Amino acid sequence: MSGLSRPLLLAVGCLAALCVITAAGNTTLAPNVTTASSPPPTTTTVPVSPTTLSPLPVTTPAPDICGSRNSCVSCVDGNATCFWIECKGKSYCSDNSTAGDCKVVNTTGFCSVPTTTPTPTNSTAKTTTLPSTTTTSTTATTSGTTNTTLSPTIQPTRKSTFDAASFIGGIVLVLGVQAVIFFLYKFCKSKERNYHTL
């Protein structure tokens, strides 16, 4: 082999190895996200008196479904329009949130010791931001869609596979560059041989 072909052969081998390593390391997995189609949630700002610890949202009257509930958890957990009212030792579930000096509860976090086990329902989604004692307004976010459980789908782990197209493309690229270098070298050497000094 001539002096120039050995480095070129070494360069081809190195570039081929580099192509194989690059193709083997180029595996990316795209996350599979499942989203539920629902209307955007509505945000309502409701004034809160500074003496109460729970928000007093404005509600629309509902049929008498709140009166049949007998515990704080079952009252506020299953329905967005029901409120648990604790007033002077008497507690009851109502759809009217305006009670005089009574404590109005609309989240299970403010319920005192529950008397019965909550019955899970799937009627409406309800998210409420709890106010601090220094704020005078709170933001309640509710949407009219049903609760859905989204479980992410897990893609099986993909083993690194050899990408033949990338490998062949890399070889063609390297051989093309080497051919250009080879012909430039031959061209320069032929010009050098033609002009010998005497």
Swiss-Prot record:
Known glycosylation sites: N26, N32, N79, N96, N106, N122, N147
BP terms from Gene Ontology: heterophilic cell-cell adhesion via plasma membrane cell adhesion molecules; muscle organ development
Alphabetical list of InterPro entries matching this protein: CD164_MGC24
Post-translational modification, as annotated: Highly N- and O-glycosylated; contains sialic acid.
Cellular component terms (Gene Ontology): endosome; endosome membrane; lysosomal membrane; lysosome; plasma membrane
Residue ranges annotated as Extracellular topological domain: 25-163
Coiled coil regions in record: none
Segment forming the signal sequence: 1-24
Subcellular location: Lysosome membrane; Endosome membrane; Cell membrane
Chief localization: membrane
Region spans: Required for endosomal and lysosomal localization: 192-198
Region (Disordered): 32-54, 117-152
Membrane topology: Single-pass type I membrane protein
A matching Pfam family: MGC-24
Biased segments, Low complexity type: 33-54
Keyword presence, Glycoprotein: yes
Record key words, sorted: Cell adhesion, Cell membrane, Endosome, Glycoprotein, Lysosome, Membrane, Myogenesis, Signal, Transmembrane, Transmembrane helix
Residues spanning the membrane: 164-184
Cytoplasmic topology ranges: 185-198
Top-level taxon of origin: Eukaryota
Function: Sialomucin that may play a key role in hematopoiesis. May be involved in cell adhesion. Promotes myogenesis by enhancing CXCR4-dependent cell motility. Positively regulates myoblast migration and promotes myoblast fusion into myotubes.
Family statement drawn from the similarity comment of this UniProt entry: Belongs to the CD164 family.
Quaternary data: Interacts with CXCR4.
Name this polypeptide is given: Sialomucin core protein 24
Protein source organism: Bos taurus (Bovine)
